[in-house]
Amino acid sequence: MEINASKRGPRLHVKLCGELDHHSAEQTRNMLDTLLKDIPVRDLTLDLSGVSFMDSAGLGVILGRYRILSMRGGHLTVTGMSGAIDKIFRMSGIYAIVDRV
């Protein structure tokens, strides 16, 4: 998994590239947590346009970052989902708590 991050005002924008599955979930989780620790923001946008595959472990990574941001009073936004990933999100009900653009 490749991660590119940039701070845009009060928001951290992170683009993920690769597969977000059980093989990459721990590494991705650790990298995102380090970013959220080092860059004190309340709001995070995850650009998933470069994610070619996601399974339930990837969904868990996103839900965990939602929890961290919620405890800070912040928001998580996702963007750039492929049709397959959008379907996973709709079926899981994640759009009830995570914003999408």
State the predicted function of each range.
Residues N4-N30:
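STAS-typified acidic loop motif
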Residues R8-G9, S49, V101:
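Conserved catalytic submotifs in the C-terminal HATPase_c
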Residues H22-V98:
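Amphipathic alpha-helical interaction surfaces in cytosolic regulatory modules
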Residues M1-E2, V101:
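Absolute protein N-terminus
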